[in-house]
A protein has these predicted regions:
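Active-site histidine-anchored catalytic micro-motif
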Residues: 1-153
Length: 153
C-alpha cells in the first residue's frame, strides 16, 4: 500500500504556544510516524507545498496544492491524504473535486479539532479513517475524514 501524504497546515500540523496555535515542522510528521508505529503497513511519500492556517488560505494556495499534486504520478499511489485546517476545508475539497474529476485514486482530506499532542484531538483518528478508507478501496474522488464526537450507538 503506497499513499502520498500532502501537508498543508491547519491545527492538525500545529502546536500550542501559550494561547496561540503555531505551525510546527515536526508535528505534522507525527501523523505518519504514529501510524507506522501502530500499524506499520503503509509506505508513505510526503509533500509540503505550503504551511498555512486555513483561515489564512487564499486562492494561490489552492493552485499551489493542485500544482503539487499534478507534479506526481498519482496513479502510482493507492490514495492521497491531504492534511488541512477546518476553516476552509470545504472550499479546498470542492476545488480538488473539480480539478481531479475522473482521477482513479481517492483523495481524502483530514483535519483536527486540536493539535495532535492534545489528548482531545481527533486528528489521528481522522488520519486512520482516511487510510482505512483508502485500504478498503471504498471509492475514487475527493472525500473528507472527520470524526465530530463520540455518539451513542
Amino acid at each position: 500500500m503506497k499513499i502520498l501524504v500532502v501537508f498543508t497546515g491547519g491545527t492538525i500540523g500545529c502546536v500550542r504556544k501559550g494561547e496561540v496555535l503555531s505551525p510546527d515542522n515536526e508535528q505534522k510528521y507525527m501523523l505518519t510516524q504514529m501510524y507506522l508505529d501502530r500499524y506499520g503497513d503503509v509506505d508513505f511519500d510526503t509533500a509540503e507545498p505550503y504551511t498555512v492556517l486555513s483561515e489564512n488560505l487564499e486562492g494561490c494556495h489552492m493552485n499551489r496544492l493542485a500544482d503539487c499534486l499534478q507534479s506526481y504520478d498519482l496513479n502510482s499511489y493507492d490514495g492521497i491524504v491531504v492534511t488541512h485546517g477546518t476553516d476552509t476545508l470545504q472550499y479546498t475539497s470542492a476545488f480538488l473535486a473539480y480539478i481531479f474529476d475522473g482521477l482513479n485514486v481517492p483523495i481524502v482530506l483530514v483535519s483536527a479539532n486540536y493539535p495532535l499532542d492534545d489528548s482531545r484531538s481527533n486528528g489521528f483518528e481522522n488520519f486512520v479513517g482516511a487510510i482505512d478508507f483508502i485500504k478498503a478501496g471504498s471509492g475514487n474522488g475527493v472525500f473528507v475524514s472527520y470524526k465530530n464526537a463520540d455518539l451513542p450507538v
